[in-house]
């Protein structure tokens, strides 16, 4: 099973992808972990071909769960996906989550992706690209985009699941884990 998890920043993509990959016993690939290089270098902007190559390499596996919304590398992994999960979380819950996540990361000063040295900094909160502002600014656009892509429960003939809360997430994880056992 190869599953792509999408949703706006703070919707629970990575949390869902980690839990699903653990339940399925397959690797979890976080596209942010591929994109964000040491010193917050944005690989997708600075070397889009290399970003695409790395995502395509990760997508070669027989089974995985990937999370992220990078449209510039969609062809590298969406074409191999057997299912899609759209984390359709309400705007106010997204904002609460992303503010709490940013705060806890800034206080803990933990490295976000191993080997990058990248850490959340309070002084970055005012920048346009910061996840708090990004989540607010892109929530509506992302929701419309994912509704158009997955609104009928499929994407190019493959299942697309819409998850709006934790209970739905738990049920979907259990369902997909059961389905994976029968394959």
Where are these regions (language model features)?
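Hydrophobic positions on the alpha1 helix immediately C-terminal to the Walker A/P-loop
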Residues: 16
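Active-site signature of alpha/beta-hydrolase-fold catalytic machinery across serine-
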Residues: 19
């Amino acid at each position: 099973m190869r599953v792509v998890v999408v949703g706006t920043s703070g919707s629970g993509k990575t949390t869902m992808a980690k839990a699903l990959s653990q339940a399925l016993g397959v690797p979890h690939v976080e596209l942010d972990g591929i994109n964000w290089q040491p010193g917050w270098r944005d690989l997708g902007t600075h070397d889009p071909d290399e970003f695409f190559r790395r995502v395509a390499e990760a997508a070669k596996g027989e089974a995985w769960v990937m999370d992220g919304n990078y449209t510039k590398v969609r062809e590298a992994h969406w074409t191999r996906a057997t299912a899609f999960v759209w984390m359709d979380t309400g705007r106010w819950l997204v904002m609460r989550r992303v503010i709490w996540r940013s705060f806890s990361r800034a206080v803990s000063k933990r490295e976000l992706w191993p080997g990058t040295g990248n850490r959340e900094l309070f002084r970055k909160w005012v920048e346009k690209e910061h996840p708090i502002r990004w989540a607010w600014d892109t929530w509506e656009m992302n929701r419309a985009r994912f509704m158009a892509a997955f609104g009928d429960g499929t994407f190019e003939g493959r299942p697309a699941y819409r998850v709006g809360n934790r209970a739905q997430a738990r049920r979907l994880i259990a369902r997909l884990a059961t389905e994976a056992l029968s394959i």
